[in-house]
């Protein structure tokens, strides 16, 4: 499938590692010109925390000026939060931190990138299957990803001329996931994606090949959520 992304100007947040880094590599492999915003250092990274509005706004402007504008924006910056912590042990501050990064950070990214996006531009945000399903000890994370899905739909209605979609993968083998799940990912009893799998989904949603797709949450979970509770 042709992506027609060669020469396009792409901004990726959270692009120094994990899914974000996989997206950076995938876009560059297609010939796109990519700028990276991350709070961690790295080659060609413009450093900013997505929860710091002035810093993020300046970083977006820096990348956009370097690239001569933006055609695609990909929001991959995120945190998992206190995974495995029961509700009673979850503080309001801990809950707020997850939403600040995963939700407000995406909002601020879109807000400050929009002036640089032309008609026909595309925004892809990183959601999760946790927007639709849940496991114990994941209330903050699930709430944040549910908000990303709702915000994606609202943005698609609010902003004409730019497409907004989000990818919602199940567990992905990334440094963040390994920090939460540890050795479970060495021999998992459930299907696990690689960061490159998600990057290919992002490429499709960012490309003209997905022109009619707008306001959608693309759930990629190996069909797990499709199963009935009725015993097979």
Features from the language model and the residues they span:
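C-terminal helical subdomain
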Residues: 162, 166-169, 183-224
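Conserved NAD(P)H cofactor-binding loop of Rossmann-fold oxidoreductase domains
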Residues: 76-83, 222-223
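Residue(s) in the substrate-gating loop at a strand-loop-helix junction
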Residues: 128
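Active-site loop immediately N-terminal to the catalytic Tyr-X3-Lys motif
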Residues: 133-139
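Active-site helix of classical SDR
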Residues: 110, 144, 152
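Substrate-binding pocket helix/loop in short-chain dehydrogenase/reductase
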Residues: 83-87, 91-96
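Alpha-helical segment proximal to the catalytic Tyr-Lys
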Residues: 115, 156-158, 211
């Amino acid at each position: 499938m042709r992506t027609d992304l060669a020469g396009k100007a792409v901004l990726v947040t959270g692009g120094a590692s994990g899914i974000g880094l996989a997206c950076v590599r995938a876009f560059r492999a297609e010939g796109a010109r990519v700028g990276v915003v991350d709070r961690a250092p790295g080659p060609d990274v413009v450093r900013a925390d997505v929860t710091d509005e002035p810093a993020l706004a300046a970083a977006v402007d820096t990348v956009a000026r370097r690239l001569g504008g933006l055609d695609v924006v990909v929001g991959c910056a995120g945190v998992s939060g206190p995974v495995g912590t029961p509700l009673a042990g979850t503080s309001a501050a801990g809950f707020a931190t997850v939403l600040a990064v995963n939700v407000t950070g995406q909002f601020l990214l879109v807000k400050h990138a929009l002036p640089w996006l032309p008609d026909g531009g595309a925004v892809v945000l990183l959601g999760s299957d946790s927007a639709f399903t849940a496991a114990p000890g994941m209330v903050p994370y699930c709430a944040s990803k549910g908000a990303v899905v709702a915000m994606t739909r609202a943005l698609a209605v609010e902003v004409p001329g730019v497409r907004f979609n989000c990818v919602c993968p199940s567990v992905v083998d990334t440094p963040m996931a390994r920090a939460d799940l540890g050795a479970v990912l060495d021999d998992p009893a459930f299907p696990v994606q690689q960061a490159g799998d998600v990057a290919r989904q992002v490429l499709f949603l960012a490309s003209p090949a997905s022109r009619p797709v707008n306001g959608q949450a693309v759930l990629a979970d190996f069909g797990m959520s499709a199963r009935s509770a009725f015993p097979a």
